[in-house]
Protein backbone atom coordinates (compact mmCIF):
# COMPACT_ATOMS: atom_id res chain seq x y z
CA UNK A 1 0.00 0.00 0.00
CA UNK A 2 2.88 2.37 0.81
CA UNK A 3 4.41 1.69 -2.61
CA UNK A 4 1.17 2.62 -4.38
CA UNK A 5 0.81 5.79 -2.31
CA UNK A 6 4.41 6.80 -3.12
CA UNK A 7 3.87 6.17 -6.83
CA UNK A 8 0.73 8.32 -6.80
CA UNK A 9 2.80 11.23 -5.51
CA UNK A 10 5.24 11.12 -8.41
CA UNK A 11 3.03 10.19 -11.38
CA UNK A 12 -0.43 11.30 -12.53
CA UNK A 13 -1.33 7.74 -13.55
CA UNK A 14 -0.01 4.48 -12.15
CA UNK A 15 -0.58 1.33 -14.17
CA UNK A 16 0.01 -1.98 -12.41
CA UNK A 17 -0.14 -5.20 -14.39
CA UNK A 18 -1.70 -7.53 -11.84
CA UNK A 19 -1.31 -11.27 -11.79
CA UNK A 20 -4.30 -13.41 -12.55
CA UNK A 21 -4.20 -15.41 -9.30
CA UNK A 22 -5.07 -12.60 -6.91
CA UNK A 23 -5.43 -14.73 -3.77
CA UNK A 24 -1.67 -15.47 -3.71
CA UNK A 25 -0.36 -12.16 -5.07
CA UNK A 26 -0.25 -9.43 -2.44
CA UNK A 27 0.70 -6.62 -4.87
CA UNK A 28 -2.23 -7.46 -7.14
CA UNK A 29 -4.67 -7.73 -4.24
CA UNK A 30 -3.61 -4.42 -2.70
CA UNK A 31 -3.58 -2.75 -6.12
CA UNK A 32 -7.16 -3.81 -6.77
CA UNK A 33 -8.24 -2.53 -3.36
CA UNK A 34 -6.50 0.83 -3.76
CA UNK A 35 -7.08 1.56 -7.45
CA UNK A 36 -9.29 4.29 -8.86
CA UNK A 37 -10.23 1.98 -11.73
CA UNK A 38 -9.29 -1.49 -12.93
CA UNK A 39 -9.25 -3.05 -16.38
CA UNK A 40 -10.02 -6.76 -16.32
CA UNK A 41 -8.82 -8.26 -19.59
CA UNK A 42 -9.71 -11.77 -20.65
CA UNK A 43 -9.21 -13.53 -23.94
CA UNK A 44 -12.22 -14.99 -25.73
CA UNK A 45 -11.11 -18.59 -25.50
CA UNK A 46 -12.32 -21.51 -23.41
CA UNK A 47 -9.22 -21.56 -21.19
CA UNK A 48 -9.61 -17.88 -20.27
CA UNK A 49 -13.36 -18.15 -19.73
CA UNK A 50 -12.89 -21.21 -17.49
CA UNK A 51 -10.19 -19.53 -15.43
CA UNK A 52 -12.17 -16.31 -15.13
CA UNK A 53 -15.22 -18.25 -14.00
CA UNK A 54 -13.14 -19.85 -11.25
CA UNK A 55 -11.98 -16.40 -10.04
CA UNK A 56 -15.30 -14.54 -10.29
CA UNK A 57 -16.40 -15.21 -6.74
CA UNK A 58 -13.21 -13.59 -5.46
CA UNK A 59 -13.41 -10.67 -7.93
CA UNK A 60 -17.03 -9.97 -7.04
CA UNK A 61 -16.27 -9.91 -3.31
CA UNK A 62 -17.47 -6.76 -1.57
CA UNK A 63 -13.83 -5.78 -0.90
CA UNK A 64 -13.31 -5.17 -4.62
CA UNK A 65 -15.41 -2.27 -5.85
CA UNK A 66 -17.01 -3.75 -8.96
CA UNK A 67 -18.23 -0.30 -10.08
CA UNK A 68 -14.65 0.71 -10.83
CA UNK A 69 -13.89 -2.42 -12.87
CA UNK A 70 -13.93 -2.16 -16.65
CA UNK A 71 -14.31 -5.58 -18.23
CA UNK A 72 -12.48 -6.03 -21.52
CA UNK A 73 -12.83 -8.90 -23.97
CA UNK A 74 -9.35 -9.09 -25.42
CA UNK A 75 -7.86 -10.55 -28.59
CA UNK A 76 -11.33 -10.97 -30.09
CA UNK A 77 -11.22 -12.79 -33.41
CA UNK A 78 -14.10 -12.83 -35.92
CA UNK A 79 -15.03 -16.42 -34.98
CA UNK A 80 -15.22 -15.64 -31.24
CA UNK A 81 -18.46 -15.03 -29.44
CA UNK A 82 -18.31 -12.07 -27.11
CA UNK A 83 -21.65 -13.25 -25.71
CA UNK A 84 -19.81 -16.10 -23.98
CA UNK A 85 -17.42 -13.58 -22.46
CA UNK A 86 -20.27 -11.39 -21.31
CA UNK A 87 -21.82 -14.46 -19.70
CA UNK A 88 -18.61 -15.17 -17.81
CA UNK A 89 -17.59 -11.58 -16.98
CA UNK A 90 -20.88 -9.81 -16.74
CA UNK A 91 -21.27 -6.85 -19.06
CA UNK A 92 -18.25 -6.21 -21.27
CA UNK A 93 -17.18 -2.56 -21.40
CA UNK A 94 -14.73 -2.86 -24.29
CA UNK A 95 -13.74 -5.34 -27.00
CA UNK A 96 -10.11 -5.36 -28.11
CA UNK A 97 -10.03 -7.00 -31.54
CA UNK A 98 -7.25 -9.34 -32.61
CA UNK A 99 -4.40 -7.56 -34.39
CA UNK A 100 -1.92 -9.53 -36.46
CA UNK A 101 0.48 -6.59 -36.29
CA UNK A 102 0.37 -6.60 -32.49
CA UNK A 103 0.95 -10.35 -32.40
CA UNK A 104 4.00 -9.95 -34.65
CA UNK A 105 5.34 -7.19 -32.40
CA UNK A 106 4.80 -9.41 -29.36
CA UNK A 107 6.59 -12.36 -30.94
CA UNK A 108 9.54 -10.17 -31.97
CA UNK A 109 9.75 -8.49 -28.55
CA UNK A 110 8.96 -5.07 -29.98
CA UNK A 111 5.73 -4.05 -28.23
CA UNK A 112 6.69 -0.38 -28.01
CA UNK A 113 6.74 0.05 -31.79
CA UNK A 114 3.99 2.10 -33.41
CA UNK A 115 1.10 0.20 -34.93
CA UNK A 116 0.77 1.55 -38.44
CA UNK A 117 -1.02 -1.07 -40.53
CA UNK A 118 -4.55 -0.38 -41.72
CA UNK A 119 -5.90 -3.65 -40.30
CA UNK A 120 -4.75 -2.55 -36.81
CA UNK A 121 -7.01 0.51 -36.89
CA UNK A 122 -9.92 -1.14 -34.98
CA UNK A 123 -7.50 -2.14 -32.19
CA UNK A 124 -6.05 1.38 -31.97
CA UNK A 125 -9.54 2.94 -31.91
CA UNK A 126 -10.60 0.69 -29.02
CA UNK A 127 -7.42 1.57 -27.09
CA UNK A 128 -8.26 5.26 -27.60
CA UNK A 129 -11.77 4.66 -26.21
CA UNK A 130 -10.33 2.89 -23.16
CA UNK A 131 -7.82 5.71 -22.53
CA UNK A 132 -10.57 8.32 -22.81
CA UNK A 133 -12.90 6.47 -20.42
CA UNK A 134 -10.34 5.37 -17.83
CA UNK A 135 -7.85 8.26 -17.89
CA UNK A 136 -10.02 11.05 -19.30
CA UNK A 137 -7.57 11.80 -22.11
What are these regions (language model features)?
Residues 2-28:
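Switch II (G3) loop of P-loop NTPases
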Residues 1-9, 103-110:
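P-loop/Walker-type NTP enzyme "switch/lid" segment
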Residues 13, 37, 91-94:
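Well-ordered beta-strand positions
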Residues 108-137:
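NTP-binding/hydrolysis catalytic cores, primarily Walker-type P-loop NTPases
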Residues 75-79, 83-116:
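Beta-strand-loop-alpha "switch" segments that mediate conformational coupling across diverse proteins
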Residues 52-65:
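Conserved C-terminal guanine-recognition region of P-loop GTPase G domains, centered on the G4
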Residues 21-22, 35-53:
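Conserved Switch II/interswitch segment of TRAFAC-class P-loop GTPases
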Residues 15-17, 39-44, 69-75:
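Conserved beta-strand segments of the P-loop GTPase G domain that flank and frequently precede/overlap
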